[in-house]
A protein has these predicted regions:
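Cys-His-centered catalytic/binding microenvironment captured across papain-like cysteine peptidases
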Residues: 20-26, 188-192, 201-257
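Active-site-adjacent substructure of cysteine-protease-like catalytic cores
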Residues: 158-202
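Generic detector of well-ordered alpha-helical segments enriched in charged/polar residues
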Residues: 24, 65, 69, 143, ...
Length: 257
């Protein structure tokens, strides 16, 4: 690897919080309630698999990054008003585009400045009733596929770096902020995906169990485990993925990352 490439890789590995509590300290903080409410603050439809749906005419595939990011954007920049009159499908699409046009790492907007979604009480109810309109508004799939940090999946990462990701995720969730993670088991061509971590707990062995929203499965939460002894992540319960070691990286938490 060229020196310039090594420096770039090191910069990405070290990027993030300037000071993060050790994992022993961080995991003792209780996971706050309702950082994200599954089945309320999540989409009602799935990002679909091309492999599992060959020939499907209305296939909605390769939107996992858009959907995971969108859940955070709706949480930070939208406001639902169930008592207000409903809009047309085209008007709803424009509202969705306004929500997702704002970078997901930016601070939440105050209620009066948020994009109003009238006629629905939650993202789940909205995306269930107005699925086509919501999908039409979730733009930007191409840029997620070519995001410059996607190259991280091809490199083995040191265990200390993966522990740092776990510590940062714990710190963010403890402060009430869900965390989007890029997860991969490359070079196995099974998992190059993204999830949103929004809760955590310890198991009896002291491992950290992150509860995640998986865009591929709108029916139940997933789980990603950080094995503290091995200092690595595992796919404990991700849709259509074998249980086993993975690598995880934070996504969309800054202008370059």
């Amino acid at each position: 690897m060229r020196p310039s490439a090594r420096l770039l890789l090191l910069a990405v590995m070290l990027s993030g919080c300037a000071s993060v509590a050790t994992i022993d300290v961080a995991v003792q903080r209780p996971s706050p309630a309702e950082v994200l409410r599954f089945g309320v603050d999540t989409f009602a439809f799935a990002n679909e698999s091309r492999t599992n749906n060959p020939g499907k005419p209305d296939l909605y595939a390769n939107y996992c990054f858009v959907m995971a990011r969108g859940v955070i954007q709706f949480q930070r920049f939208a406001r639902f008003e169930p008592g207000a009159p409903r809009l047309t499908a085209d008007e709803y699409t424009e509202r969705v585009k306004r929500v997702v046009a704002r970078a997901s790492w930016r601070d939440p907007l105050p209620p009066d400045d948020r994009v109003v979604i009238p006629g629905y009480a939650s993202l789940h109810a909205f995306s269930h009733d107005q699925e086509a309109a919501v999908k039409a508004g979730l733009v930007g799939r191409f840029w997620t596929l070519v995001h410059w940090t996607n190259w991280r999946v091809v490199f083995p990462m040191p265990r200390w770096q993966q522990e740092r990701v776990a510590r940062e995720a714990l710190a963010e969730v403890a402060e009430g902020r869900p965390v989007q993670l890029l997860v991969t088991n490359f070079p196995t061509w099974e998992l190059n995906h993204t999830v949103v971590a929004y809760a955590y707990r310890q198991d009896s062995d002291g491992n950290v169990l992150f509860t995640v929203y998986d865009p591929n499965d709108p029916r139940e939460p997933g789980r990603v485990t950080f094995d503290r002894a091995e200092r690595r992540f595992e796919a404990s319960r991700l849709y259509d993925t074998h249980v086993g070691p993975i690598r995880a990286f934070r996504m969309y938490y800054g202008a370059l990352l």
